[in-house]
């Protein structure tokens, strides 16, 4: 099944800004998160949304996606140890230039130590876990050297022999007709798969591969202040090295589950708190939830809807360095929808005592609105 366009998944245009991408992701992730949405297919939808956001939120990945789409740009171009155009449709021309310009020196020793492959693990964190950090234990499947043959691939008591077809070089010379004439190309030996070794008696555990897949438990300390999409490198916890080379690394990518009340922007947290018409008019003190606990907030008289109050130090700990972000409290004045006769009479009396006037700032707004209606 073909993948959907990432921009279509997030419901945004291809010219969308980074802020628009983030807002679209937050909206959709809240709607389809499996912990919130129990409908069938919500989990797959959430994975699709997360994948699209991961690709489009990173400028480099987005540029690559815009150019190549879902196709791997390295596919068919030989993303092997040699890099560049080491394989695929262009290998013939590279071999030609190797022949004429001494490219044979690029051939690697098949028995040289090589670093193991890096691994990636996606860890889902609750909103507060990302803020305060946690100690976690994860399980990852990875290739390790076989304990029976110690990575040689040979049956215990025997040793691999030099490949009789390539002489232990891992490659063979193949003659080829080209526009430049008849040349000799180097090809990976198909008998030893480039290892330069021939195993007569294979290890009964790994069947000659020298490696087996195991599940490894790894303890990971998630630092306080990580954000959605960030990653952490765990050195040496990737796949085992080849020919005695060092292990690869493990990259833990964090996916933060959105909170239904708090919203995060960098190290600051934003919340919207409702207050009554009376509280806004006369002033009050209210309790406001923060990730650090309940805080008492003074609401001055005459507070307007949309007014923002800052609670310093009640945000997210800085991931690098000291200090903590702030929490921004945005108040929303709730106008009563149902009033009894007595309440209506009180408001009418209030309006008559004030002459139903508005202050200068509001008056200026109404003047502008009147001019807009008149077309001035």
UniProtKB/Swiss-Prot annotation:
Pfam (any one): DnaJ_C
Domain notes per entry: The J domain is necessary and sufficient to stimulate DnaK ATPase activity. Zinc center 1 plays an important role in the autonomous, DnaK-independent chaperone activity of DnaJ. Zinc center 2 is essential for interaction with DnaK and for DnaJ activity.
Per-repeat ranges for CXXCXGXG motif: 146-153, 163-170, 189-196, 203-210
This protein's name: Chaperone protein DnaJ
Function: Participates actively in the response to hyperosmotic and heat shock by preventing the aggregation of stress-denatured proteins and by disaggregating proteins, also in an autonomous, DnaK-independent fashion. Unfolded proteins bind initially to DnaJ; upon interaction with the DnaJ-bound protein, DnaK hydrolyzes its bound ATP, resulting in the formation of a stable complex. GrpE releases ADP from DnaK; ATP binding to DnaK triggers the release of the substrate protein, thus completing the reaction cycle.
Annotated zinc fingers (CR-type), start-end: 133-215
Subunit-structure text: Homodimer.
J domain boundaries: 5-69
Alphabetic keyword roster: Chaperone, Cytoplasm, DNA replication, Metal-binding, Repeat, Stress response, Zinc, Zinc-finger
BP terms from Gene Ontology: chaperone cofactor-dependent protein refolding; DNA replication; protein refolding; response to heat
Annotated Zn(2+) 2 binding sites: 163, 166, 189, 192
Cofactor comment text: Binds 2 Zn(2+) ions per monomer.
SMART domains: DnaJ (SM00271)
Chain sites annotated for binding Zn(2+) 1: 146, 149, 203, 206
Protein's cellular compartments: Cytoplasm
Family the UniProt entry places it in: Belongs to the DnaJ family.
């Amino acid at each position: 099944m073909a993948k959907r366009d990432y921009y279509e998944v997030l419901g945004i245009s291809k010219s969308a800004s980074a802020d628009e991408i983030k807002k679209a992701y937050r909206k959709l992730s809240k709607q389809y998160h499996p912990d919130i949405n129990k409908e069938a297919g919500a989990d797959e939808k959430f994975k699709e949304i997360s994948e699209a956001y991961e690709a489009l939120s990173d400028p480099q990945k987005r540029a690559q996606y815009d150019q190549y789409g879902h196709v791997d740009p390295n596919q068919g171009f030989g993303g092997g140890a040699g890099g560049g155009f080491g394989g695929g449709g262009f290998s013939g021309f590279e071999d030609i230039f190797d022949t004429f310009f001494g490219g044979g020196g690029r051939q690697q020793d098949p028995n040289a130590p090589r670093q193991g492959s890096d691994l990636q693990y996606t860890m889902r964190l609750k909103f507060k876990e990302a803020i305060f950090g946690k100690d976690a234990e994860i399980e990852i499947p990875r290739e390790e050297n076989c304990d029976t043959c110690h990575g040689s691939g040979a049956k215990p008591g025997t040793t691999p022999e030099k490949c009789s077809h390539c002489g232990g070089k891992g490659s063979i010379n193949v003659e080829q007709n080209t526009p430049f004439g008849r040349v000799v190309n180097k090809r990976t030996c198909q008998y030893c798969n480039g290892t330069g070794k021939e195993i007569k008696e294979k290890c009964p555990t790994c069947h000659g591969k020298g490696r087996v897949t195991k599940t490894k438990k790894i303890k990971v300390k998630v630092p306080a202040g990580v954000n959605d999409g960030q990653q952490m490198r765990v050195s040496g916890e990737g796949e085992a090295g080849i020919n005695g080379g060092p292990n690869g690394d493990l990259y833990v990518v964090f996916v933060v589950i959105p909170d239904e009340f708090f919203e995060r922007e960098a190290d600051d947290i934003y919340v919207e708190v409702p207050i009554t018409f009376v509280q806004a008019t006369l002033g009050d003190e209210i309790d406001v939830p923060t990730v650090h606990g309940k805080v008492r907030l003074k609401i001055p008289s005459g507070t307007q809807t949309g007014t923002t109050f800052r609670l310093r130090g009640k945000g997210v700990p800085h991931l690098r360095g000291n200090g903590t972000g702030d929490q921004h409290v945005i108040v929303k004045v709730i106008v009563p929808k149902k009033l009894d006769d007595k309440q209506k009479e009180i408001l009418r009396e209030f309006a008559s005592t004030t002459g139903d006037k508005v202050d200068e700032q509001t008056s200026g707004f109404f003047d502008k609105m009147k001019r807009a209606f008149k077309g001035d």
